[in-house]
């Protein structure tokens, strides 16, 4: 289990590094830059040059990339060119939903995966084991978006157990908010739980 978690952490770090490089390179090759976005395509060259210097866009690309990464590590995500406010403020405004959703999905992942993996390992090659492995294989194979749509169709549209209208807000009540996060959390949790359950089973059988 520790090897799996360490591998997941290293994979996450590598993915973040690669994603940051790809995003930076895409922004580099796109026509125009933030200065032109702010001032418009008809802005005077001297005005553009002054704004580029103010924003640090006149520095070499490698310097700008490392300044961007170091700023993020210190919590400085820069200024949103669209909203004209620090990006960190926009993140804080939305983390009130994203963070609880992530925690909820993680909790469901562990609650589902650990018992499933333990039961499958303890009943190796039985019908129970084969059933659990079959379900987890389905959980790995089915795309998340299709699974999420199916959950909404069954539990919100057909059975009316949940709302399909989005997150109601924490001001409507804690449990109503949790109810609004349940379907998205399940959609996020089941694919990860399927992977973790299979890893758990293999790890237990190897010991």
Predicted regions and their residues:
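Alpha-helical transmembrane segments of integral membrane proteins
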Residues: 2-4, 13-16, 92-129, 144, ...
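Membrane-water interface at transmembrane helix exits
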Residues: 23, 27, 31, 35, ...
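An internal, D/E-rich "acidic patch" concept
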Residues: 58-114
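Hydrophobic alpha-helical transmembrane segments of membrane transport/permease proteins
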Residues: 15-66, 159-180
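Short amphipathic alpha-helical coupling elements at transmembrane boundaries
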Residues: 3, 40, 50-53, 67-71, ...
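Membrane-water interface segments at the C-terminal ends of transmembrane alpha-helices
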Residues: 22-29, 59, 67-70, 134-165, ...
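Juxtamembrane loop-helix boundary motifs flanking transmembrane segments in multi-pass membrane proteins
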Residues: 1, 57, 61, 65, ...
């Amino acid at each position: 289990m520790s090897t799996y978690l360490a591998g997941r952490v290293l994979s996450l770090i590598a993915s973040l590094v690669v994603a940051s490089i790809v995003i930076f390179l895409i922004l580099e090759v796109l026509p125009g830059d933030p200065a032109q976005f702010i001032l418009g395509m008809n802005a005077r060259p001297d005005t553009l040059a002054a704004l580029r210097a103010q924003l640090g866009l006149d520095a070499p690309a490698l310097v700008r990339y490392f300044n961007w990464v170091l700023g993020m590590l210190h919590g400085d995500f820069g200024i949103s060119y669209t909203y004209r406010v620090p990006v960190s403020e926009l993140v804080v405004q939305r983390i009130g939903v994203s963070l609880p959703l992530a925690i909820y999905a993680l909790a469901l992942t562990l609650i589902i995966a650990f018992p499933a993996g333990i039961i499958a390992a303890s009943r190796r090659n039985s019908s129970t084991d084969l059933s659990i492995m079959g379900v987890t294989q389905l959980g790995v194979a089915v795309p998340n978006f299709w699974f999420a749509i199916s959950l909404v169709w069954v539990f919100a549209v057909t059975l009316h157990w949940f709302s399909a209208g989005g997150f109601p807000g924490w001001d409507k009540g804690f449990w109503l908010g949790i109810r609004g996060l349940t379907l998205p959390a399940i959609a996020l949790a089941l694919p990860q739980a399927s992977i973790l359950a299979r890893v758990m089973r293999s790890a237990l059988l190897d010991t």
